[in-house]
Amino acid sequence: MTDVTERSEVERILEDPAFAVPEADAASRRPADRFRAGVSRFANGATHAARRRRLEALLAQVDVDDLAADAASRTTAMRPAGAEEVAARVPVACLAARLGFADPDAMPAPVAALAAYYPTGWPSAPADTAATLLLAAARAGHEHTDDVRAGSDAGDGVGVGVGVDLDHDAALRVQLLVQAHAATAGLIAAALRLPAARDADVPTSDLLATVLRDAPPVRQTRRIAPDGDALVLHLDGPDHDSPHDPRTLAFGAGPRACPAGAHALAIASAVVDEVRAC
């Protein structure tokens, strides 16, 4: 396994489709493994492309201004619980509501359990339980709706490896919650911990940009080189090629860049603004 730390080289690899991601175990029958095998993050080629298109279609239905307003409202209501609890719960709950989950306020706890397992896929009974609950909530929230399914017919690869009892969109909706928990919650908490957060003259956008550049919530990702070498890409390493500040790689780069960057920033900005206004 090779560590890649220089940001220019990390960006080059992220932008090169010849570098694949490690794929999930599509043969496993564990619920968390089946979920992992049904998302875009751990798929390559045409399967990844189909799932990515569907993720983008789901996100296109979420108005970022409405999302920010909901995040601000939930933050105000949860303010007595403290900033850490707000950061852990609000991003997942407001996104779950917009994505049509049944009982969105109950989603943060199982999402946290599944997110702990998500990057590695190591066997986890709590993750299996959480995956079962979340997939059921994703389905239940849509069983009486006319959901738009453009690009997700049975032959597009969206549901490959998931199982016949899991519709094509449920795993992708859960994927968005899991990745929001890991990235957006961490972004909020880190921004609020910055000393500059206590200075009302410093815009929230500057706080978020600082965290994303210098201390991204998700600091590593993995790729498989064309020669089979396993690579660990560090998103927070040095950037000797940049004449000014280091480039920001928190949302990735290239064809697998985070599809929900605007949504994450809308939620984080609203939450941090509300907490700082206290």
Model-derived regions: residue spans:
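Cytochrome P450
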Residues: M1-C278
